[in-house]
């Protein structure tokens, strides 16, 4: 896992670095999901500004380019309907996080359906982002999803209680939980669990293979009211 997050800053961001690359990669991802028979997809991305030789891209432009690519794809293939979730990175400052909230509001009518907390779980200090997620909860129809307990360092009761206080509609990964937090999730009622089996196994975020994944435990207790969603990273 420590080698995973640097891939974005060291490689991926340097490859997807202009409008053409953004459009190309978005359409390629959509095609892969359509070919797999997916009919409804939610993509997530962290808005970023890009300095490119072909022209600088603002965070607003970044989101618009991706939404335009989605619209372009859906015009050619009606099998797949796609919506967008904008992510706040744990490394973001509060002003940067509030900018993402504002982008969600601006693009909600074009297909942005949610806001996410993502990024390197080793980055502490996320309590500074609380005002951004409280602002997001005030936007009617906007869902809130959070990367949750994906690593031991981000699985402390203190952090997880903070995240639950943001009133998320869904939480992702949900690996490193105390029994107290697990019960708190159940007590919340109808909070969606976004479980990423392939990511958790191949990135060695859990011990054991697919048969050891905590999906089975939650599935066997699905009568307790937590909807399960299978996701890919």
What are these regions (language model features)?
Residues 147:
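Short HxH-centered metal-ligating active-site micro-motif
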Residues 1-142, 150-170, 175-191, 197-233:
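Metal-cofactor-binding active-site regions of metalloenzymes
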């Amino acid at each position: 896992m420590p080698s995973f997050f640097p891939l974005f800053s060291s490689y991926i961001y340097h490859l997807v670095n202009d409008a053409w690359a953004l459009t190309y990669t978005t359409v390629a991802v959509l095609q892969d999901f359509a070919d797999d028979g997916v009919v409804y997809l939610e993509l997530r991305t962290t808005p970023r500004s890009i300095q490119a030789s072909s022209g600088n891209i603002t965070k607003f432009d970044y989101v618009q380019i991706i939404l335009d690519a989605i619209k372009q794809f859906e015009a050619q293939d009606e099998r797949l309907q796609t919506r967008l979730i904008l992510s706040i990175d744990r490394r973001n400052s509060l002003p940067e996080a509030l900018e993402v909230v504002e982008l969600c509001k601006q693009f909600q009518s074009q297909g942005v359906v949610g806001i996410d907390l993502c990024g390197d779980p080793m980055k502490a200090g996320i309590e500074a982002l609380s005002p951004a997620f409280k602002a997001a909860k005030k936007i009617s129809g906007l869902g809130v999803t959070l990367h949750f307990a994906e690593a031991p360092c981000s699985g402390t009761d203190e952090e997880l209680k903070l995240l639950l206080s943001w009133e998320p509609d869904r939480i992702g990964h949900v690996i490193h939980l105390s029994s107290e937090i697990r019960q708190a999730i159940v007590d919340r009622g109808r909070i969606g669990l976004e479980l990423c089996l392939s990511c958790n196994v191949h990135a060695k975020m859990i011990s054991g293979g697919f048969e050891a994944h905590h999906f089975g435990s939650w599935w066997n207790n699905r009568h307790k009211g937590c909807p399960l969603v299978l996701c890919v990273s």
